[in-house]
Amino acid sequence: MTGAGMRRIRVGLIFGGKSAEHEVSLQSARNILQALDPQRFEPVLIGIDKQGQWHLSAQESFLLDADDPSRIALRHSGRGLAVLPGAASAQLRAVDAEQALAQIDVVFPIVHGTLGEDGSLQGLLRMANLPFVGSGVLGSAVAMDKDMAKRVLRDAGLEVAPFACFTRHTAAQADVQTLIAQFGLPLFVKPANQGSSVGVSQVRSAEEFSAALELALRYDHKVLVEAAIAGREIECAVLGNATPQASVCGEVVVHDAFYSYQTKYIRDDGAATVIPADIDAHTQHRIQQCALQAYQALDCAGMARVDVFLCADGRIVINEVNTLPGFTRISMYPKLWEASGLDYRSLVTRLIELALERHADDGRLYSSVVTHA
């Protein structure tokens, strides 16, 4: 498609969104845009503002305060976009124009959090018959919901931290003394469907529990109460569809009480990363195998970052599977692949190729009943 006389592949980069991770998404989008191979790809920038409206953005100036993670913002273009599900082509249309946009060949969604990586956006793109980077509806939805993900991982024979789950309607039944007796202190209280440690609290005493529960319920209708796991925080990147590969492992060394949103994206001194992690080859292989098993158990595709705790007794406890990991300047996913021999640009290219391959495979499936004479 990119040879002599052939046009470049048009990549729709979708970013922003209504979630609490809006700013993280903007940082990721900026980096991915810079990493796109200009010889092969033509970017089309689609920003979603905090009200959920889609806008066609200019490549040169789509961000405000791009170098400041605490102030970065989406510059509104004023040109709204609509999606036309079911069309074979021209699925994106400017609402103030007569004609559709030039055909987008593949979408790279980098909308973190609710509505972006929980299967919602993936379902819309699938209905619009657009290839997209990353996991499909099922893998995205299950991995995003920490309660459901833990149940699936546990059933697959992987160890997860002991936990209890409460909804907005059952939160009054969350007895802190019972939870402390069951899990000990500290406890972690977190929204079931958020990422980047948004709304997460470490509870060190019974008196701190109510405020932590209230904070988590501001971000989700379902809340997880989790036992703290004493162990090193190790991360492994996974790449691929049916036959995924695992990267070298990295370690997050947290200087604060836990790996909070501020520590991850705002402060420069809250944590350090060590790549590759200082672990022996056998331990790394075990973690890689657990990461691959978790990836396939959750029906992931394209990419995911698998976070685990490595305990002093050698146990590997799965903490989280992130199907849409960050691509910011400090994000582990691209760093892990770079340490494994795959540079940032090659990684982005491979993710786009995987999206096109999966879409082609899906296109071979029957969409109606086939009868034989």
Swiss-Prot record:
Residues 150-353 form the ATP-grasp domain. Binds 2 magnesium or manganese ions per subunit. It is found in: Cytoplasm. One of its GO terms (biological process) is cell wall organization. Pathway: Cell wall biogenesis; peptidoglycan biosynthesis. Its cofactor is Mg(2+); Mn(2+). Mg(2+) 2 binds at residues 320, 322. GO terms for molecular function: ATP binding; D-alanine-D-alanine ligase activity; metal ion binding. It is an enzyme of class 6 (ligase). The keyword RNA-binding does not apply. Mg(2+) 1 binds at residues 307, 320. The keyword Glycoprotein does not apply. One of its GO terms (cellular component) is cytosol. Its EC number is 6.3.2.4. InterPro entries: ATP-grasp (IPR011761), ATP_grasp_subdomain_1 (IPR013815), D-Ala_lig_Van_CS (IPR000291), D_ala_D_ala (IPR005905), Dala_Dala_lig_C (IPR011095), Dala_Dala_lig_N (IPR011127), PreATP-grasp_dom_sf (IPR016185). It catalyses: 2 D-alanine + ATP = D-alanyl-D-alanine + ADP + phosphate + H(+). ATP binds at residues 180-235. Belongs to the D-alanine--D-alanine ligase family. HAMAP family: Dala_Dala_lig (MF_00047). This is D-alanine--D-alanine ligase A. The gene is ddlA.
